[in-house]
A protein has these predicted regions:
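N-terminal carbohydrate-binding/catalytic regions of secreted carbohydrate-active enzymes
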Residues: 33-41
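C-terminal end-of-chain micro-motif
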Residues: 1, 156-157
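Active-site and channel-lining beta-strand-loop segments
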Residues: 24, 41-44
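Acyl-donor binding region in acyl/amide transferases
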Residues: 11-14, 38, 45-46, 52-148
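Short amphipathic alpha-helix that is part of the acyltransferase structural core
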Residues: 1-34
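C-terminal edge-of-domain segments
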Residues: 150-155
């Protein structure tokens, strides 16, 4: 992109993972920062960061070929109107420009997905949830929601 893209009063900028993770640490309701990413984007109003999206390889074991499929692993906003839709749409456009064929994400089953629907994503239904165990039988982290998830996706090609 040669110049920042705007939607209403928001501006899109690439950001470093540490910036996205700091935002998530401060504002995300139920998740911690991510370990890695392919790219992260920030939504700004003026000079204020109002939302971030981190996009990486598919996390689930059978989530898709990481050279073809991207996954939104974190999206976090400060509540600014339309920031979620702005970031989901931007993530899909950037993924398409990079040559990916599909982008997906998982949200809690109790979340509505309104921003995803507004951005042209498709609800693919319930997927996953619960809690896995380590191969040695020890329980995994319990600081994340264990309820069912809904997978949403958008074809990019």
């Amino acid at each position: 992109m040669s110049s920042p893209q705007t939607s209403n009063r928001m501006t899109l900028r690439p950001i470093e993972l540490k910036t996205a993770n700091a935002f998530v640490t401060t504002l995300h309701r139920h998740h911690k920062p991510v370990q890695g990413h392919r790219f992260s984007l920030g939504a700004y109003v003026g000079s204020s960061l109002v939302g971030t999206v981190s996009v990486g390889r598919p996390v689930a074991r059978f989530g898709g070929d990481p050279l073809v499929v991207l996954e939104v692993t974190r999206l976090c906003t400060d509540g600014t109107a339309d920031a979620c839709s702005f970031l989901y749409g931007a993530a899909a456009r950037v993924g398409k420009a990079m040559g990916y064929q599909r982008i997906q994400t998982y949200i809690l089953a109790t979340e509505t997905g309104t921003s995803l629907k507004a951005s042209g994503w498709t609800d693919e239904g319930l997927a996953g949830g619960g809690q896995w165990k380590h191969t040695d039988g020890k329980p995994r982290r319990t600081d994340q929601p264990t309820e069912r998830k809904r997978r949403w996706a958008k074809m990019l090609s």
